C-alpha cells in the first residue's frame, strides 16, 4: 500500500487588505495485493494412511490493483480592512474537488500450491486455465463550488455576515446539478451599549445572536441516477421454463440536492469577571427533498431508485454553564450542559415504510420521529384458560396460561398487524453532561458524567 500527500500554495498581496491565494492538494493511494487460497489435505485419524478428499473448487490465486486520486484546487480572493470602528471582510473563490478510483482484479482457479500456476483438478497437470475471472471498477466524481462571504462589524458591538455557496456535483444530471446555498448571521453585543455600562462593570458580558441558512447534501452513490446492469446471469421463471437474464438497478435522472433550512437564536452571557459563562441556543431545522430509496415488495422484481422524497423537521434547545475560579494554588471549575431535541417526519408521499433491524420493526410515518419503533403493546400475562377464551389472541397461535397478553388495539377480537403501536424511537429527548476539574500544585483530578 502506497500513500502520497502533497500540498502547494501561493499567496499574493494585491493592495493593502486584499490578497489572492491559490492552493493545490493531492492524495494518491495505490493498493496492490496478491493472494492464494489452497485447500490442505488432512487425515481422519493419526493411523490413517489415506487423506480425506479435498475440495479444490475454492483453490485460486488473485492479483488486485487499485489507484485512487483526490485532487483539490482552490483560488481565493480575501479582503480584510478596518476603518476606525468599522471592520469589513470579504471572500470570493472557486474550488474543485475531483476523485478518481480505478481497480482491477485477475483471478485464476485451481492453483498449484507451490508455483501459483493454473492446474487441472483431475490430472494435476499445469496449463488448464479455464477457471478464470477478471473484475474492473471505476469511480469518478467532481464537485465544483463558487463561494463568497461578506462580513461587517462596528465598534465590536454589531456584527453581520452573509455567505453563499453555488455547488455543482457530477452525481446529478446537468439540468439538476447546481444548487445555491446562502446563509446570514447577525450579532449584537448588548453589554457594549452605553445604557449597559453598569451591567458591564458590575456583572459581565451579554451578546445576542441569530443565524439562518440553507445547506445542501449530495449523499448518494456516484451513479445512482443511472439505470445500471450487473455482469452476471440471473435466472428467473417465465411460465413453465427457467430463462436467463441480467440483473439491473433502476436510476432516476432528475435527482437533485437534498436541502436543509436551519434557524438558530442564542444568548452568550458572562458573570463575575468571566468566571461564570452561560450560553443558550434554540435551533430549528427543516429538511426537504430527502435523498432516500423507497421500499417496495419483492414481487416488484428490483429495488426502487434513489429519489428526492420526504420532508422532516428537527428542533430543540441547549444550555451550557461553565464556571472556573482560582484561589491561591487551587484552581477548580465545572461545566454543565443540558439539551432537548425532537424530530418528526412531515411528509412521506405515497406510503409508510416498515423495515426490520435486529428483530425490531421501525417505521417511517408522517407525524412521528424518523424510524420509530413499531410493534405490539403488552397487558401482562394470561392467568387462566378462561381468560384466554375471553381475550383476543394472535391469529393461528396457540396460547396457554403464562403467555404474554397483547393489547387488541382495534377491538376486533384477534391480534394481528393492525394492532401495532408506535412504541418509541432511538432519539432521547433530554441529554446532559457534567465535568468537574480540580488542580493543586501539579496534581489534577477530574470527573465526567453524561446521561439521557
List where the protein language model places each region:
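Residues embedded in well-ordered regular secondary structure
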Residues: 10-13, 386-403
Amino acid at each position: 500500500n502506497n500513500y502520497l500527500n502533497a500540498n502547494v500554495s501561493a499567496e499574493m498581496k494585491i493592495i493593502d487588505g486584499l490578497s489572492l491565494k491559490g492552493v493545490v492538494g493531492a492524495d494518491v493511494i495505490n493498493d496492490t495485493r496478491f493472494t492464494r487460497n489452497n485447500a490442505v489435505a488432512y487425515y481422519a485419524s493419526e493411523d490413517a494412511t489415506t487423506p480425506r478428499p479435498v475440495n479444490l473448487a475454492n483453490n485460486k490465486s488473485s492479483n488486485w490493483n487499485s489507484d485512487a486520486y483526490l485532487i483539490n484546487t482552490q483560488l481565493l480572493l480575501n479582503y480584510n480592512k478596518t476603518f476606525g470602528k468599522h471592520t469589513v471582510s470579504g471572500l470570493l473563490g472557486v474550488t474543485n474537488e475531483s476523485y478518481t478510483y480505478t481497480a482491477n482484479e485477475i483471478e485464476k482457479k485451481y492453483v498449484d500450491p507451490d508455483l501459483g500456476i493454473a492446474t487441472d483438478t483431475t490430472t494435476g497437470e499445469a496449463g488448464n486455465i479455464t477457471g478464470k475471472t477478471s473484475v474492473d471498477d471505476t469511480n469518478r466524481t467532481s464537485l465544483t463550488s463558487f463561494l463568497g462571504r461578506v462580513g461587517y462589524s462596528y465598534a465590536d458591538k454589531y456584527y453581520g455576515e452573509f455567505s453563499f455557496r453555488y455547488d455543482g456535483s457530477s452525481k446529478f444530471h446537468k439540468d439538476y446539478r447546481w444548487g445555491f446555498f446562502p446563509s446570514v448571521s447577525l450579532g449584537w453585543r448588548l453589554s457594549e451599549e452605553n445604557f449597559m455600562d453598569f451591567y458591564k462593570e458590575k456583572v459581565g458580558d451579554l451578546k445576542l445572536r441569530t443565524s439562518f441558512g440553507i445547506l445542501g447534501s449530495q449523499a448518494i452513490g456516484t451513479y445512482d441516477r443511472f439505470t445500471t446492469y450487473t455482469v452476471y446471469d440471473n435466472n428467473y421463471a417465465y411460465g413453465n421454463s427457467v430463462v436467463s437474464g441480467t440483473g439491473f438497478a433502476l436510476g432516476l435522472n432528475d435527482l437533485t440536492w437534498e436541502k436543509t433550512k436551519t434557524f438558530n437564536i442564542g444568548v452568550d452571557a458572562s458573570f463575575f469577571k468571566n468566571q461564570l459563562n452561560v450560553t443558550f441556543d434554540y435551533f430549528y431545522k427543516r429538511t426537504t427533498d430527502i435523498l432516500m430509496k423507497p421500499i417496495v415488495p419483492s414481487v416488484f422484481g428490483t429495488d426502487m431508485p434513489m429519489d428526492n422524497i420526504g420532508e422532516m423537521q428537527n428542533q430543540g434547545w441547549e444550555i451550557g454553564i461553565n464556571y472556573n475560579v482560582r484561589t491561591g494554588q487551587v484552581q477548580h471549575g465545572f461545566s454543565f450542559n443540558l439539551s432537548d431535541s425532537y424530530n418528526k417526519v412531515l411528509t412521506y408521499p405515497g406510503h409508510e415504510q416498515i423495515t426490520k433491524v435486529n428483530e425490531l420493526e421501525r417505521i417511517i410515518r408522517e407525524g412521528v420521529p424518523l424510524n420509530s419503533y413499531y410493534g405490539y403493546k403488552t397487558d401482562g400475562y394470561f392467568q387462566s384458560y378462561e381468560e384466554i377464551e375471553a381475550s383476543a389472541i394472535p391469529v393461528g397461535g396457540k396460547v396457554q396460561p403464562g403467555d404474554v397478553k397483547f393489547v387488541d388495539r382495534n377491538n376486533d377480537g384477534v391480534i394481528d398487524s393492525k394492532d401495532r403501536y408506535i412504541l418509541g424511537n432511538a432519539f432521547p429527548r433530554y441529554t446532559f453532561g457534567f465535568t468537574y476539574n480540580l488542580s493543586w500544585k501539579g496534581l489534577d483530578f477530574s470527573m465526567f458524567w453524561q446521561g439521557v
